[in-house]
C-alpha cells in the first residue's frame, strides 16, 4: 500500500512539469510547466535569466543548450511568486497572474470571443486562436522583443504611425527594453536603422532588391535571406528573412551593445553569419557632414573631394563630428547649359565602392543618363547615384554618413565646381613632369628584371608540372599556339568563358583544337589552373571533354582541348533558329549523356570529383550532338569515403548554385545534382535561369516549372516549337526529375545513380516539394547576370567568400 501511495505522489510531482499542448481558461500554464511547439522546435515557459530570482515568460529553442531566449512577454514586470501562472481571461485576452492573482502582464486587448486557446507554433510564433473561427486573435510575431525568427517581420505604417521594431535587452540578465532599437525607415527604398535612444547609431544603406547596399562585402550577386515589401501608395513596408541554409533554426538578434547578429544552428553550435556594425566607420556620421570614413586599417576620416575641414583645430584633435565644408562654391549654371558645359558649369566627381550617404530621395528616372541630367538641372542636388536594383537616388543638402569601402560598394557622383577638377589636373601635370624621367628609368629596370623573373618562372612552371601526374597531356610552346590561332585573331574567337576567352586553332598537322586563354584578371590563378590540368588528365569518359595539353609562357596560361564542332549547348537551345536542330529526342539524349558524365565523376572514376560549375555553357557538343562536360577549374576531388566538404571561397554561377553551397559553402554530389536539375529545366524549356521572368509577380524559371508541373504535370514546359517531336509523358517525367534535383534540402535530392536510373527506366518517381526559389518572386532571388558572358565578382562575408560567375 505504501508503494502505491509513493507512486501516486511521484506522478503528482512529475505531472506539472510536462509540456502542454495549449493554454485555455481551464488549463493555465504554471511556473513548473512548459508549452512545446508540435515539432518540438520551440518551448514556452517561465525562466530566470542568469539564475536571477526574477521570473519571466519566454520562448526559447527547445533542444539547444545553452538556452537562447527569443521572446519575452513580461519584459518590464518580472514575477517572483512560485504561484504565478499564464492563462486566458474571460474576455479572451492572454494574462499573466502573480501569486495574489493580480494581472502582471496581458496582451492588452479584449476580444468578443471567450472560447479561445493559446498555442506555440513550429515557427516560434505564440498565438491566441478563436476556437470557433480559427482566426488568430493575437500573436507574438506582432510584438517583437530583441529577436526576429523566420516569418516574423519588422514593419512601418505611415498612415497610423505604427511600426514594429526590435529592442535590445537592458543587459544579458535583464530583458527590460535597453537603449538600442532596430527598425526599417519609411524612405523609398527603405533601409535598416539602429537607433541609440532616438539618435541614429548604424544604418545598412538603401534596399536594392536582394540586399542592403550599405553592408560591406555584399553586392548584387549576394544570395540573400532577406525580403522587403513596400507599398508606396499605402505608406507601408515590411522586412523579413527566411532560412536558406540546410538547417531549420536561425535567428536575428539585437544585443545589449547595439549589434545586429544573424546566427544559425549547424547541429553542433551556433554559427555567426553577420555581425553589424563591425567597423568604427559603420557608426553613424562618424566623420560629420561631407566627411568620408575610410575603412582602412586603422579607419580614418577624410573630407570628400572638394571639401575641407570645418575646423582645422578640431579635425587635428581627432574630433571629426563637425565635418567638412565646400572649398569652392558651386556655380549652379547647369540649367542654362544642359547640352554643353561651359568652363564655369558644375561637374560631378565619381567615387567608387561607397556606402551612399543618408537621407536619399528616389527619383523615377529610367537610366543613369537621365539621373545625371536631372541632378545637374537642379541646383540643390548635391549628389546622385544609379544603383542596380534601385535606380536613381539623389541627395538634396548635406551628405552625411558616407563610407569608403575597400570593395563591393556603389558609385556616388558628388557635385563640385568645375575649378576643383581643373586645379587638380594642373597639379597632376606638374607632378607628372617632375617624376616622369625617374619613372621611365625605373620601368626600364623593372622590365629587365621582369623578363628574367618570367624566364625563371616559366622554367619553374614546367618543372612543377613535370613533377605532377599529368601523363598523356602535352606541353605546347607559345609560338605553336600563336600560329594555330593566327595570333589569337578575333575571327578565331569562339566565346568568352568565366576565366577568359576561348579560341579555335589548327595545328600544323591539320588537327583542330580549342584554346582556353586564361585572363590574368579572371580570378583563375595557379590553384585552379593546376587543378584543371591534374583533374582532366586523370579523367577519361565519352561525356567529358578531353584535354590535349597546356602552355605556360610568363604570365600566359593556356589549356588546349579537343575541338568541339558545335561549340556549347547554350548556342543551340537559346537561339530562336538553331534550337530546331535539337529536337526532343536529341535533347533527351543530351540530358542522359550529361547524367552519365556526372555519374562517372561522382562514382565511377578513380577520383571522386565534384564539378561545382555545371551549367549550360559548360556543356560542349561534338559533331553528333553528344554532350561533353567541360571547365574543371572549380572542381574538387573527394577522398573515397568523403561525401561532403565546405569552403570559405564559394565559387560558381548564380542560379545554378544550390542553397547550401551558395549560403554555407557546403558542396557535395547533391550540389552538382542541383545544378544538373537547373540545366535539365533549361534544356527542356529553352529558357535561361538568369533571364526568364513571367507573371505579374516576376517569377523565375523554377517557379514557372513548379506551376507547370502542378497544372499539367510539366508536359507544357517544353519549348512549344518542339512539341511535335516529343512524347508528352517523357517530357513530364523529365520535368519531375528536374524538380526533384532542385529541392531546397540536399537530403531530398536524388543522387547521381538514382537520377540516371530515373531517366532510363519507368519506375515510379517521388513527389517533389515546392522549390524554395519557386516560393519567392524573382525580385526576392539573387541578382543574376543578364548576358551570356560570365561575370566574376568577389563578395567577402563573415563565413564565406562568394564568387559569382
From Swiss-Prot:
<feature type="domain" description="Bulb-type lectin">
    <location>
        <begin position="22"/>
        <end position="141"/>
    </location>
</feature>
<feature type="glycosylation site" description="N-linked (GlcNAc...) asparagine">
    <location>
        <position position="319"/>
    </location>
</feature>
<keyword id="KW-0067">ATP-binding</keyword>
<feature type="binding site">
    <location>
        <begin position="494"/>
        <end position="502"/>
    </location>
    <ligand>
        <name>ATP</name>
    </ligand>
</feature>
<keyword id="KW-0812">Transmembrane</keyword>
<dbReference type="GO" id="GO:0031625">
    <property type="term" value="F:ubiquitin protein ligase binding"/>
</dbReference>
<keyword id="KW-0430">Lectin</keyword>
<dbReference type="GO" id="GO:0106310">
    <property type="term" value="F:protein serine kinase activity"/>
</dbReference>
<dbReference type="InterPro" id="IPR003609">
    <property type="entry name" value="Pan_app"/>
</dbReference>
<keyword id="KW-0723">Serine/threonine-protein kinase</keyword>
<feature type="binding site">
    <location>
        <position position="516"/>
    </location>
    <ligand>
        <name>ATP</name>
    </ligand>
</feature>
<keyword id="KW-0325">Glycoprotein</keyword>
<dbReference type="GO" id="GO:0030246">
    <property type="term" value="F:carbohydrate binding"/>
</dbReference>
<keyword id="KW-0245">EGF-like domain</keyword>
<feature type="transmembrane region" description="Helical">
    <location>
        <begin position="429"/>
        <end position="449"/>
    </location>
</feature>
<dbReference type="GO" id="GO:0046777">
    <property type="term" value="P:protein autophosphorylation"/>
</dbReference>
<dbReference type="InterPro" id="IPR000858">
    <property type="entry name" value="S_locus_glycoprot_dom"/>
</dbReference>
<keyword id="KW-1015">Disulfide bond</keyword>
<feature type="topological domain" description="Extracellular">
    <location>
        <begin position="22"/>
        <end position="428"/>
    </location>
</feature>
<feature type="modified residue" description="Phosphoserine">
    <location>
        <position position="537"/>
    </location>
</feature>
<dbReference type="Pfam" id="PF11883">
    <property type="entry name" value="DUF3403"/>
</dbReference>
<dbReference type="GO" id="GO:0004672">
    <property type="term" value="F:protein kinase activity"/>
</dbReference>
<feature type="disulfide bond">
    <location>
        <begin position="375"/>
        <end position="381"/>
    </location>
</feature>
<feature type="region of interest" description="CaM-binding">
    <location>
        <begin position="577"/>
        <end position="594"/>
    </location>
</feature>
<keyword id="KW-0418">Kinase</keyword>
<dbReference type="Pfam" id="PF00954">
    <property type="entry name" value="S_locus_glycop"/>
</dbReference>
<feature type="glycosylation site" description="N-linked (GlcNAc...) asparagine">
    <location>
        <position position="50"/>
    </location>
</feature>
<feature type="domain" description="EGF-like">
    <location>
        <begin position="277"/>
        <end position="313"/>
    </location>
</feature>
<dbReference type="InterPro" id="IPR008271">
    <property type="entry name" value="Ser/Thr_kinase_AS"/>
</dbReference>
<keyword id="KW-0675">Receptor</keyword>
<feature type="glycosylation site" description="N-linked (GlcNAc...) asparagine">
    <location>
        <position position="248"/>
    </location>
</feature>
<keyword id="KW-0472">Membrane</keyword>
<keyword id="KW-0808">Transferase</keyword>
<feature type="disulfide bond">
    <location>
        <begin position="287"/>
        <end position="301"/>
    </location>
</feature>
<feature type="modified residue" description="Phosphothreonine">
    <location>
        <position position="647"/>
    </location>
</feature>
<feature type="modified residue" description="Phosphoserine">
    <location>
        <position position="690"/>
    </location>
</feature>
<feature type="active site" description="Proton acceptor">
    <location>
        <position position="613"/>
    </location>
</feature>
<dbReference type="InterPro" id="IPR011009">
    <property type="entry name" value="Kinase-like_dom_sf"/>
</dbReference>
<dbReference type="InterPro" id="IPR001480">
    <property type="entry name" value="Bulb-type_lectin_dom"/>
</dbReference>
<feature type="modified residue" description="Phosphoserine">
    <location>
        <position position="617"/>
    </location>
</feature>
<dbReference type="GO" id="GO:0048544">
    <property type="term" value="P:recognition of pollen"/>
</dbReference>
<dbReference type="InterPro" id="IPR021820">
    <property type="entry name" value="S-locus_recpt_kinase_C"/>
</dbReference>
Amino acid at each position: 500500500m505504501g508503494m502505491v501511495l509513493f507512486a501516486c505522489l511521484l506522478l503528482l510531482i512529475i505531472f506539472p512539469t510536462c509540456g502542454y499542448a495549449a493554454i485555455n481558461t481551464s488549463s493555465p500554464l504554471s511556473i513548473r510547466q512548459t508549452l512545446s511547439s508540435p515539432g518540438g522546435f520551440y518551448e514556452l515557459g517561465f525562466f530566470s535569466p542568469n539564475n536571477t530570482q526574477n521570473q519571466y515568460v519566454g520562448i526559447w529553442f527547445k533542444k539547444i543548450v545553452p538556452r537562447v531566449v527569443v521572446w519575452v512577454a513580461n519584459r518590464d514586470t518580472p514575477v517572483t511568486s512560485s504561484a504565478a501562472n499564464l492563462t486566458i481571461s474571460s474576455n479572451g485576452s492572454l494574462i499573466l497572474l502573480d501569486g495574489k492573482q493580480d494581472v502582471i502582464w496581458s496582451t492588452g486587448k479584449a476580444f468578443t470571443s471567450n472560447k479561445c486557446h493559446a498555442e506555440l507554433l513550429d515557427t516560434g510564433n505564440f498565438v491566441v486562436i478563436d476556437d470557433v473561427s480559427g482566426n488568430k486573435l493575437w500573436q507574438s510575431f506582432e510584438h517583437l522583443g530583441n529577436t526576429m525568427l523566420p516569418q516574423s517581420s519588422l514593419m512601418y505604417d505611415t498612415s497610423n504611425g505604427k511600426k514594429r521594431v526590435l529592442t535590445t535587452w537592458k543587459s544579458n540578465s535583464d530583458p527590460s527594453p535597453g537603449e538600442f532599437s532596430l527598425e526599417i525607415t519609411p524612405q523609398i527604398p527603405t533601409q535598416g536603422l539602429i537607433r541609440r535612444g532616438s539618435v541614429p547609431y548604424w544604418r545598412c544603406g538603401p534596399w536594392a532588391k536582394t540586399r542592403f547596399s550599405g553592408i560591406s562585402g555584399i553586392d548584387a550577386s549576394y544570395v540573400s535571406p532577406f525580403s522587403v515589401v513596400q507599398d508606396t501608395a499605402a505608406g507601408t513596408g515590411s522586412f523579413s528573412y527566411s532560412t536558406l541554409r540546410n538547417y531549420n533554426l536561425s535567428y536575428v538578434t539585437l544585443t545589449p551593445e547595439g549589434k545586429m547578429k544573424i546566427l544559425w544552428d549547424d547541429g553542433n553550435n551556433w554559427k555567426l553569419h553577420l555581425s553589424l556594425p563591425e567597423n568604427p566607420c559603420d557608426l553613424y556620421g562618424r566623420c560629420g557632414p561631407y566627411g568620408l570614413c575610410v575603412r582602412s586599417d586603422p579607419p580614418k576620416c577624410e573630407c570628400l573631394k572638394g571639401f575641407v575641414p570645418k575646423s582645422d583645430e578640431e579635425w587635428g584633435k581627432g574630433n571629426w563630428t563637425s565635418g567638412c565644408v565646400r572649398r569652392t562654391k558651386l556655380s549652379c549654371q547647369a540649367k542654362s547649359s544642359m547640352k554643353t558645359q561651359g568652363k564655369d558649369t558644375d561637374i560631378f566627381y565619381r567615387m567608387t565602392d561607397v556606402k551612399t550617404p543618408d537621407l536619399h530621395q528616389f527619383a523615377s528616372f529610367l537610366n543613369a543618363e537621365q539621373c545625371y541630367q536631372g541632378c545637374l538641372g537642379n541646383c540643390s542636388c548635391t549628389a546622385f547615384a544609379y544603383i542596380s536594383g534601385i535606380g536613381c537616388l539623389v541627395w538634396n543638402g548635406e551628405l552625411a554618413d558616407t563610407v569608403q569601402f575597400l570593395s563591393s560598394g556603389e558609385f556616388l557622383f558628388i557635385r563640385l565646381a568645375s575649378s576643383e577638377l581643373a586645379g587638380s589636373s594642373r597639379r597632376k601635370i606638374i607632378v607628372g613632369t617632375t617624376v616622369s624621367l625617374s619613372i621611365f628609368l625605373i620601368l626600364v629596370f623593372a622590365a629587365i628584371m621582369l623578363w628574367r623573373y618570367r624566364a625563371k618562372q616559366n622554367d619553374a612552371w614546367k618543372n612543377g608540372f613535370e613533377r605532377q601526374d599529368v601523363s598523356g597531356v602535352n606541353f605546347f610552346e607559345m609560338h605553336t599556339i600563336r600560329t594555330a590561332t593566327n595570333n589569337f585573331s578575333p575571327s578565331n574567337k569562339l566565346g568568352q568563358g568565366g576565366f577568359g576567352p576561348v579560341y579555335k586553332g589548327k595545328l600544323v598537322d591539320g588537327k583542330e583544337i580549342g584554346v582556353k586563354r586564361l585572363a590574368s584578371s579572371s580570378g583563375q590563378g595557379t590553384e585552379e589552373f593546376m587543378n584543371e590540368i591534374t583533374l582532366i588528365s586523370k579523367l577519361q569518359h565519352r561525356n567529358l571533354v578531353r584535354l590535349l595539353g597546356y602552355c605556360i609562357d610568363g604570365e600566359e596560361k593556356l589549356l588546349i582541348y579537343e575541338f568541339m564542332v558545335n561549340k556549347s549547348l547554350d548556342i543551340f537551345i537559346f537561339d530562336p533558329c538553331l534550337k530546331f536542330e535539337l529536337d526532343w529526342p536529341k535533347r533527351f539524349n543530351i540530358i542522359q549523356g550529361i547524367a552519365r558524365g556526372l555519374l562517372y565523376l561522382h562514382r565511377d572514376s578513380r577520383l571522386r570529383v565534384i564539378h561545382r560549375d555545371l551549367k549550360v555553357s559548360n556543356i560542349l557538343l561534338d559533331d553528333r550532338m553528344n554532350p561533353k562536360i567541360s571547365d574543371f577549374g572549380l572542381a574538387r576531388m573527394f577522398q573515397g569515403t568523403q561525401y561532403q566538404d565546405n569552403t570559405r571561397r564559394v565559387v560558381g554561377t548564380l542560379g545554378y548554385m544550390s542553397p547550401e553551397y551558395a549560403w554555407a559553402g557546403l558542396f557535395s554530389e547533391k550540389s552538382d545534382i542541383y545544378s544538373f536539375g537547373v540545366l535539365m529545366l533549361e534544356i527542356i524549356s529553352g529558357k535561361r535561369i538568369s533571364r526568364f521572368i513571367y507573371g505579374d509577380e516576376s517569377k523565375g524559371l523554377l517557379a514557372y516549372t513548379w506551376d507547370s508541373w502542378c497544372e499539367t504535370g510539366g508536359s507544357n514546359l517544353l519549348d512549344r516549337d518542339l512539341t511535335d517531336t516529343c512524347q508528352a509523358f517523357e517530357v513530364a517525367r523529365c520535368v519531375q526529375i528536374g524538380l526533384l534535383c532542385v529541392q531546397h534540402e540536399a537530403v531530398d535530392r536524388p543522387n547521381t545513380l538514382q537520377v540516371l536510373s530515373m531517366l532510363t527506366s519507368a519506375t515510379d518517381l517521388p513527389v517533389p516539394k515546392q522549390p524554395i526559389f519557386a516560393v519567392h518572386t524573382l525580385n526576392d532571388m539573387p541578382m543574376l547576370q543578364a548576358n551570356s558572358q560570365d561575370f566574376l565578382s568577389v563578395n567577402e562575408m563573415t563565413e564565406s567568400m562568394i564568387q559569382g560567375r
